[in-house]
UniProtKB/Swiss-Prot annotation:
Lineage summary: Bacteria, Pseudomonadati, Pseudomonadota, Gammaproteobacteria, Moraxellales
Protein name as catalogued: Aminoglycoside N(6')-acetyltransferase type 1
Biological role stated in the UniProt entry: Catalyzes the transfer of an acetyl group from acetyl-CoA to the 6'-amino group of aminoglycoside molecules conferring resistance to antibiotics containing the purpurosamine ring including amikacin, kanamycin, tobramycin and netilmicin.
Organism expressing this protein natively: Acinetobacter genomosp. 13
Keywords carried by this UniProt record: Acyltransferase, Antibiotic resistance, Transferase
Pfam families linked: Acetyltransf_1
Length: 146
């Protein structure tokens, strides 16, 4: 396995995995990806198999605003992680997360946070396996006023 930061030349691989993680955001992907590549406080990683197949992706950022369940700022935040089903439970996610931890420390981060949908038990189990612990559950509301 080989892990590398995303670059322009790897956009197609990143896009393919990103669409598997967030299938409902098809049209917005490319614009957001271009924006993310320009930000110094975001990190995008791809993992490749020994046969050079893109098998996992991770997106992380440094957040300075309040992050639920944390006590400090800035905080490293796991924005998204996806490992192809055939490669899960093989340590790939652990290696990706370890790279984020090393990347975030020079920013002054001592906490690493993430979130998951309330009903996404697979994500909850993955987070726990990666060393995260649940801090709180939140339901967001909105109201149209216009």
């Amino acid at each position: 396995m080989n892990i590398m930061p995303v670059s322009e030349s790897l956009m197609a691989d990143w896009l393919g995995l990103r669409k598997l993680l967030w299938p409902d955001h098809d049209e917005a992907h490319l614009q957001e990806m271009q924006r993310l590549l320009q930000q110094t406080q975001s990190l995008q990683l791809l993992a490749y198999s020994d046969t050079q197949q893109a098998i996992a992706m991770l997106e992380a950022s440094i957040r300075y605003e309040y992050v639920n369940g944390t006590q400090t700022s800035p905080v490293a935040f796991l924005e998204g992680i996806y490992v192809l089903p055939d490669y899960r439970r093989s340590g790939i996610a652990t290696h990706l997360v370890q790279q984020v931890e090393a990347w975030a420390k020079p920013f002054g981060c001592i906490e690493f946070a993430s979130d998951a949908a309330l009903d996404n038990r697979i994500s909850h189990a993955m987070h726990q396996a990666l060393g995260f612990h649940e801090t709180e559950r939140v339901v967001y509301f909105k109201k149209h006023i216009g």
